[in-house]
């Protein structure tokens, strides 16, 4: 099931005490009405968009029974707009007719999470999830003899001299027009990159 979250929840009280709420399924809004009888109605346009119906009006006409379709003035950012809402049976009809992969997780979200939680608690909200802490960087410890440490120092010294040597050789080969100048420059660049990484750590 994809990541589910609440976009917002707004209560809009009318004379008949209809409650409007807006939830999010995978960042897509779903406007829901809870009427005085305790029945849920879902915005047809929102549902059709999630389920992949390109023509929401046609989808509602073809797959929904008119007894479970109603129009309500719905609060929006600009003003109240008349929108079509469908009941639970019609919502299920749209889900089973959809060929989009999101249909199954959307059905589970609505009927197994949102509606049961609202009926039980009067609201729907996500359960807080514990953030995974980043894994600490792995550290290793080694033991060296005095001779091995001396060899490491000389190896580093030779490495540093190699950088300077490659830089001089590259200039000489480039002046001669040799094709080897590019390869030498590449090795010098790799040496410098390793040096830069080590000096940062």
Swiss-Prot record:
Pfam families: Bro-N (PF02498), P22_AR_C (PF10548). Residues 15-122 form the Bro-N domain. PANTHER family: BRO FAMILY PROTEIN (PTHR36180:SF2), DNA-BINDING PROTEIN-RELATED-RELATED (PTHR36180). Coiled coil: none annotated. This is Uncharacterized protein HI_1418.
């Amino acid at each position: 099931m994809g990541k589910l979250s609440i976009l917002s929840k707004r209560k809009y009280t009318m004379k008949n005490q209809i409650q409007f709420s807006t939830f999010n399924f995978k960042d897509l809004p779903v406007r829901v009405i809870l009427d005085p009888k305790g029945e849920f109605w879902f915005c047809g346009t929102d549902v059709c968009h999630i389920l992949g119906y390109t023509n929401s009006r046609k989808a509602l006409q073809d797959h929904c029974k008119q007894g479970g379709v109603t129009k309500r003035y719905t609060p929006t950012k600009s003003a109240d707009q008349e929108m079509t809402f469908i009941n639970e049976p019609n919502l299920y009809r749209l889900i089973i007719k959809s060929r989009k992969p999101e249909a199954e997780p959307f059905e589970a979200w609505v009927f197994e999470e949102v509606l049961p939680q609202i009926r039980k608690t009067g609201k729907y909200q996500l359960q807080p999830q514990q953030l995974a802490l980043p894994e600490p960087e792995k550290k290793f410890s080694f033991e060296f003899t005095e001779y091995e440490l001396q060899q490491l120092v000389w190896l580093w010294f030779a490495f540093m001299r190699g950088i300077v040597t490659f830089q001089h050789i590259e200039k000489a080969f480039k002046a001669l027009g040799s094709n080897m100048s590019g390869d030498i420059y590449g090795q010098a660049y790799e040496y410098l990159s390793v040096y830069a990484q080590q000096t940062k750590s």
